[in-house]
Every structure is written in structure tokens, then in C-alpha cells.
Amino acid sequence: MRALITGITGFVGSHLAEMILRDHPEWEIHGTKRWRSPRQNLVDIEESITLHDCDLTDLSSLIRVLDEVKPDRIFHLAAQSYVMMSYRAPTATIDTNVNGTINLFEAIRTLGQDPLIHACSSSEVYGQVRDEDIPIKEDTPFRPASPYAVSKVGEDMAGYMYHHAYGLRIIRTRMFTHSGARRGEVFVDSSFARQVARIEAGIQEPVLRVGNLDSVRTFADVKDVCRAYWLLLEKCPPGEVYNIGGEATMTIGEMLDMLLDMTDLKDQIQVKVDPALLRPADVTNQVPASDKFKAATGWRPAVPYSQTLRDMLEYWRSNVVANSTTERDQ
């Protein structure tokens, strides 16, 4: 049996590959990557998986990879996933996330394949939700507040349409905030952890730059997310959509306080709002209702968010030390 992970070099993709290799060794793991994709997230498993160069915006390259792999399951995780970047590059974000997803579905149709497909959308599709709609359910209206969110609405609806029009066995998720070691430095809790590690190493002044600390998020650990994605294709019927989220709900400021409690330099670090980190249109309240998914799969988050934060901080401490010669401020 073969699983194909698009975006395997990324944060969740690499963790998912590790989990499948460890817990489901009967599965053969294939992954797509761009030719320029960094591969450090795969350093411990690269010899145990098969990588394929592939550009989601190039239909012919997807047809080539799918024809070679003939996957039984596809975890479609590849995306331009940074909200702030989407404001700077909206066309590229739409091209990668919407057109890339449609190309994947078209390649499957062209080849007449019938894999189970996980199409990974985002809680960002819901945008700024009214207080009376918290916690957010799957039937909450879309109010996308960024080009990234618009692209994920497009991906989500493409998954819906390709299932109902063509019978592709697509199951959609709208994933809420998730974190852990290897999380990209542009994302809020990972950015904070990286800054703390740099301050501890003496290569950043003791000023921690932040955006909006009042926004509310519900955090999940990447290891719990990977379990959820596997259970999704094990237990859930094609055509359905599920919110998936953790249970650690707090403001960004409360999350920062938890992180600062993990460093001996807490009292020396100044927190400073950086206007460059503020979104043009913020989404301030993201609390999921994951009841539908939990009922279908029996899934529950297992990793405390304090451990998630500690994992991120230790990751950045190791990374900063290993790259200290290039990390120093000019």
C-alpha cells in the first residue's frame, strides 16, 4: 500500500511521514517536493521514503508522479500557508493553493485512479466569526479575511465539487492552529520561541517583537494532528468535511506568557509590538467545535500545549546553536 504526501518536506508533512513509518510500517511513503525545497525536516527518514520532484502548478508533472506512484491514499498538504505572505503575493498564493489543488484532482481524473484523498483546508476560511457563532462549526459561514483564506475557500470548494461531480473520494478538513518542533519561524508561537532562543544565545537584543496579542487561538500539537489525519482516511466517509482543533484556547498574549515562563531571562526580555507583524484584517477569535470529527473517529488531543511550546523552544535552541555563525545580527 502506498501513501503520497504532497508537501512532505514541510512542517506537518514531515511529521506525518515519521508517524506512518513508525506506526504503519506496511505502508510505502512517497512525497512531492519542489526542486528547491529544503530537506532538513526529512534528515532522519529520507532513506526510508521516496521523493518526487513536482510542481503543483504544472499538471503534467502531477500526472507523471501519480502515474508512477499509483497511491492508495493522498494527503494533500502542500500549500503557501503564511497569511502575511499572501497579502504580498496574492496571485501566487491562489495559483499554488487553488490551481495546484485542481491540478491534483485533474491528474487523478485523467489517470482514472481512485485513491482516498485528504484535502487540507484551514480554519482561516471562517474569518472574523461573530461571538454567537463560537465555537465554530462546519456550517459556520465563510468570511475569508486574507488572500490565503480566499485560496483555502477555493481549495475546500474544489474538493466538494470534485467529489460530487466526478466521484473522487475526497475528505476535507478545516484545521485550526497547530504547532510543534519544525514549525516555520513566520508563525506566531514558533516566531516567539525562535526569538527567545536567539536572545538566550546572545545573538538578538532582549526585545521580543510581537503582533496582536489579544487574538484568541486554540492550539493543537502536530503529533495529535498527524494522528487525526490518519484516522480521517481510516474512518471518515468521502464527501464529508470536518473541523479539527485542539483544546488549548488562549490569547496570543497568554501563550507568550507560558513561553516566557520557560526561560531564565523572562524578567530581562522586553515585549514590543511591531506594526509590520499586524495583519491588514485580523481574525481575532478562532475556537473550534471538533465534535463531528471526534464522534466519527474517537480522536482526542493527547499532548499538552505546554509540551508543544517546550518542544518548539528546544528545537529553536538546538537550531540557533547549530547555526550560530549565520544567526548573528549584523
PLM feature segments, named:
Residues 3-23:
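N-terminal Rossmann NAD(P)H-binding glycine-rich loop of SDR-like oxidoreductase domains
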Residues 31, 207-208, 212, 241-242, ...:
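C-terminal "lid/loop" region of Rossmann-like NAD(P)-dependent oxidoreductases
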Residues 88-103, 110, 116, 124-172, ...:
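Catalytic helix-loop patch of NAD(P)-dependent Rossmann-fold dehydrogenases
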Residues 225, 229, 244, 255, ...:
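Non-catalytic, hydrophobic alpha-helical segments
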